């Protein structure tokens, strides 16, 4: 009899737990460069994106597998932000074989454009840290903050002369905080998305500075 009661309680608990499951989703607005959708009447200049390397100490230690994930991620972010400025036609050099194959399948001859300038980039600083605090020796709660910092350099290189005609930098910091009060509240686990967020912020700032340089006449892309 007791076994049947225990079994019934177990089944009821599973049903209740299953009934408590919730699912939610929402779209998140993606930050864009300052010049996105601004009124610009000028011509878009063709520009190519060259190497984007991770020159920081992050993921570059003796135990690194040699794959530059930070640099590859940064290059993808840079191409998107450059295109969204409305000042450039970004030339894709990373998928040449795929583009060639697709053109062949479509029976079309390629008419590739050249660029007078190449943008190269480096992640010069990148780091993460966690800081915590306790209030009244932890009796009133404790907190933990994850902080990610990134700094990038962008260089505009003349393809004919190899001169660096203009340079900009961008830096950003992201943090995630969580506080637990007298045993209540969540704990902030490691959030790997902070890497992408802080890279996006730093590169976006550098691209904004690049556009500002065009607008104040510091450099002029080829028309």
Please describe what each predicted stretch is.
Residues 1-9:
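Bacterial N-terminal signal peptides that target proteins for export
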Residues 14-17:
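Bacterial Sec-type N-terminal signal peptides, specifically the leucine/valine-rich hydrophobic h-region
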Residues 20-91, 95-103, 176, 182-191, ...:
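A structural "domain/chain start" motif
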Residues 40-42, 114, 143-147:
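Short coil/turn motifs at beta-sheet boundaries
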Residues 46-53, 77-81, 89-91, 116-124, ...:
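Soluble periplasmic/extracytoplasmic beta-strand elements of cell-envelope proteins
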Residues 63, 136-140:
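Short, aromatic- and cysteine-enriched interfacial helices/patches
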Residues 71, 83-137:
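Short, solvent-exposed, polar/charged sequence segments at loop or secondary-structure edges
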Residues 140-151, 157-205:
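Short secondary-structure boundary motifs at beta->alpha junctions and helix caps
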């Amino acid at each position: 009899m007791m076994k049947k009661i225990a079994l019934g309680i177990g089944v009821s608990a599973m049903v209740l737990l299953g009934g408590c499951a919730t699912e939610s989703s929402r779209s998140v607005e993606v930050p864009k460069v300052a010049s996105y959708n601004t009124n610009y009447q000028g011509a878009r200049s063709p520009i190519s994106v060259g190497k984007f390397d991770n020159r920081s100490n992050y993921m570059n230690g003796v135990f690194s597998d040699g794959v530059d994930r930070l640099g590859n991620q940064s290059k993808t972010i840079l191409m998107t932000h450059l295109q969204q400025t409305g000042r450039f036609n970004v030339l894709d050099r990373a998928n040449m074989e795929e583009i060639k194959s697709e053109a062949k399948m479509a029976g079309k001859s390629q008419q590739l454009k050249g660029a007078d300038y190449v943008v190269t980039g480096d992640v010069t600083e990148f780091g993460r840290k966690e800081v915590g605090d306790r209030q009244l020796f932890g009796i009133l709660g404790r907190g933990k903050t994850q902080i990610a910092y990134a700094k990038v350099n962008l260089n505009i290189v003349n393809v004919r002369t190899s001169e660096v005609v203009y340079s900009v930098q961008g830096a950003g910091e992201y943090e995630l905080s969580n506080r637990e009060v007298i045993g209540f509240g969540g704990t902030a686990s490691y959030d790997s998305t902070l890497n992408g967020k802080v890279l996006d912020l730093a590169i976006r700032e550098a691209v904004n500075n690049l556009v500002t340089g065009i607008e104040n006449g510091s450099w002029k892309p080829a028309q």
